[in-house]
Design a protein with these regions (language model features):
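C-terminal engagement/docking regions of AAA+ P-loop ATPases
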Residues: 1-7, 11, 18, 246-326
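Walker A/P-loop
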Residues: 3, 42-79
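Pre-Walker A (pre-P-loop) alpha-helix and adjacent loop at the N terminus of AAA/AAA+ ATPase modules
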Residues: 9-56, 244
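Conserved alpha-helical scaffold flanking the Walker A/P-loop in AAA+ ATPase domains
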Residues: 37-40, 93-113, 142
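Conserved beta-strand position immediately N-terminal to the Walker
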Residues: 48, 112, 150
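Walker B catalytic acidic pair
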Residues: 52, 115-116, 127
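P-loop (Walker A) phosphate-binding loop of NTP-binding proteins
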Residues: 53, 87, 155
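Canonical AAA+ ATPase core
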Residues: 94-99, 120, 132-229, 269-274
Length: 326
């Protein structure tokens, strides 16, 4: 069986994704789906919300990915007393020159880990979310552009935790994906312990031999390649039907917006390219439906009491919408 030659730019996306996975495997055990979904967001200029309990390697994943894609890395620990200026920076008066100089905040970076974003008041959350949307920040009326690969990985604890400020729907909608980071499987946890027993420490990534797999410029090229992936009309209609079906669901106060449809389309193109394909198939769409939709579906209180979850709504929606024939 002669498979048709794939375009070099699509092969480049697939090969880069494999190199990135190989480097990350040196420090991260398991979590394949989490890593692949973060890669999808990076290829689509999307931001990611990671949800999971403390201590399941969310910070390690973020730091390792920054190293592997040659991005500058910064981390902000969100707290109730954090101010917007702590994120974006501030103009400081220099007595020797008599001028104001910009002291840049941690947001001027490539990959930003916004840790426990739901522990800080709405005003500070809004400062970060404006930067995510515009890819620039305004300080004292002056606009400053951010790094072209600026990407936010925000973490939040599951909402039951005390002392949290849940993100409003409009702000949740700014995140391309919400990835639920699970507890590791038994075999994975044993492997993690074995590595630590042999002297591995998560703060010393270079000692684990993690190297950069792609340059910043390569990432920008890969993004261009992904945008060229083909999506046939039936698949476009399939995406629209899935998202529209959530708006009719009786368990929801709020279904997904057209922004969700756009992210589902763009993300499916990245999944196809990472698999070495020049065209999107319905399985690419299904793979991303939950991470794209779960944070955009707002349940009615009575549905929550019945134990219905956003993921279950996504599952039933996919079961109801007819899949286009290939």
């Amino acid at each position: 069986l002669d498979l048709p030659e794939i375009k070099p730019e699509i092969a480049a996306v697939r090969d880069a994704a494999n190199r990135i996975r190989q480097e990350l495997a040196k420090v991260i055990v398991g979590q394949k789906d989490v890593i692949d979904q973060i890669l999808v967001a990076l290829l689509c200029e999307g931001h990611v919300l990671l949800e999971g309990v403390p201590g399941i390697a969310k910070t390690l994943i973020a730091r390792a990915i920054a190293l592997v894609i040659s991005a500058d890395f910064a981390r902000i620990q969100f707290t109730p007393d954090l101010m917007p200026s702590d994120i974006v920076g501030t103009n400081v008066f220099d007595l020797s020159t008599g001028k104001f100089n910009l002291r840049k905040g941690p947001i001027f970076t490539g990959l930003l880990l916004a840790d426990e974003i739901n522990r800080t008041p709405p005003k500070t959350q809004a400062a970060l979310l404006e930067a995510m949307q515009e890819r620039c920040v305004t300080i004292d009326g002056e606009s400053h552009a951010l790094d072209p690969i600026f990407t936010v990985l925000a973490t939040q604890n599951p909402i039951e935790y005390e002392g949290t400020y849940p993100l409003p729907e409009a702000q949740l909608d700014r995140f391309m994906l919400k990835i639920v980071v699970p507890y590791p499987a038994y075999e994975t946890e044993v492997e993690v312990l074995s590595r630590y027993n042999s002297g591995f420490r998560s703060v010393r990534l270079d000692e684990a031999g993690v190297r950069s797999a792609i340059s910043k410029d390569e990432l920008l090229e890969l993004r261009r390649a992904v945008s060229g992936v083909l999506v046939e009309q039936p698949v476009i209609e399939y995406i629209a039907k899935i998202v529209r079906r959530t708006r009719e669901n009786r368990s929801l106060i709020l279904g997904a917006s057209p922004r969700a449809s756009i992210w589902l389309l763009l993300g499916s193109k990245a999944v196809a390219a990472m698999n070495g394909r020049e065209f999107v198939i319905p399985d690419d769409v299904k793979l991303l439906a939950a991470p794209v939709l779960r944070h955009r579906l707002i349940l009615r209180p009575e549905a929550e009491i019945e134990g219905i979850t956003p993921d279950r709504v996504v599952e039933s929606t996919l079961a109801e919408v007819e899949v286009p024939r290939q």
